[in-house]
């Protein structure tokens, strides 16, 4: 199973703080947001590689962050597409290799979006494996191991959800309808009239 980290946004709402620096690499205490996430996911036995998909503007910063924990740079590819490039590293801090993929975009207006970035990374690396897909800019206080175990038990694609009583918060996130067996019946993004209280964070298998 590959861990695909979606980190290609431009975090424009944070203003100067992320004008020239990616939000996932902001420090919270002694660690970055992304670092805290990988610290957990790297311990999951089923995960054999981390793939970070980012944009052309921030790719060098992610490369530098990965390189800070690097023992050996294993592979670099830059094929016919000017922006179709990726690098893989074996890291001293993490037991699984980290691959950084540059999606070629340079502005918020030209960004691909999460789904297209995911497809881009899969095509560039020719991935044919199960995926844990996570958004890189979330501060977490739980382990993904239980989520992976749940997906293995159910033998199907899974999304993470949690009960959210606040209508205002539901209007700012994805919301799913589920049946009694927690099978997804429908999903809406930022609905003005939520059909359930099940909020969906950006974590998928």
Regions found by a protein language model. Name each.
Residues 9:
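Conserved phosphate-binding and hydrolysis motifs of nucleotide-dependent enzymes
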Residues 25, 100, 157-159:
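Conserved beta-strand scaffold positions in the cores of enzyme catalytic domains, especially
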Residues 2-5, 13, 27, 31-135, ...:
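Conserved N-terminal catalytic core of the sugar/cofactor nucleotidyltransferase
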Residues 13, 24, 186:
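Conserved beta-strand positions that form and line the central face of beta-propeller blades
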Residues 19-23:
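Short alpha-helical oligomerization interface
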Residues 4-6, 108, 169, 196-197:
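Short, flexible coil/turn micro-motifs enriched in small/turn-prone residues
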Residues 18, 45, 66, 188-191:
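Short, flexible helix/strand-to-coil boundary loops that buttress conserved ligand/catalytic motifs
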Residues 141-205:
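Conserved core of the sugar-phosphate nucleotidyltransferase
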């Amino acid at each position: 199973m590959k861990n695909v980290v979606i980190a290609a946004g431009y975090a424009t709402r944070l203003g100067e703080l992320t004008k020239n620096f990616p939000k996932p690499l902001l420090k919270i205490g002694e660690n970055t947001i992304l670092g805290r996430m990988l610290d957990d996911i790297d311990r999951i036995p089923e995960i054999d590689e981390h793939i970070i998909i980012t944009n052309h503007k921030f790719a060098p910063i992610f490369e530098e962050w990965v390189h800070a924990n690097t023992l050996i740079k294993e592979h670099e590819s830059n094929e016919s597409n000017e922006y179709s490039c990726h690098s893989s590293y074996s890291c001293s801090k993490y037991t699984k290799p980290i691959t950084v993929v540059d999606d070629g975009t340079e502005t918020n207006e030209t960004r691909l979006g999460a789904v297209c970035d995911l497809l881009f990374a899969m095509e560039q690396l020719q991935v044919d494996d199960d995926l844990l897909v996570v958004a890189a800019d979330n501060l977490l206080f739980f382990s993904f191991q239980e989520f992976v175990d749940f997906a293995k038990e159910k033998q199907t694609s899974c999304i993470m959800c949690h009960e959210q009583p606040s209508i205002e918060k539901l209007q700012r996130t994805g919301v799913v309808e589920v049946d009694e067996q927690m099978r997804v019946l429908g999903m809406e993004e930022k609905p003005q009239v939520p059909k359930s209280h099940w909020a969906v964070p950006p974590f998928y298998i």
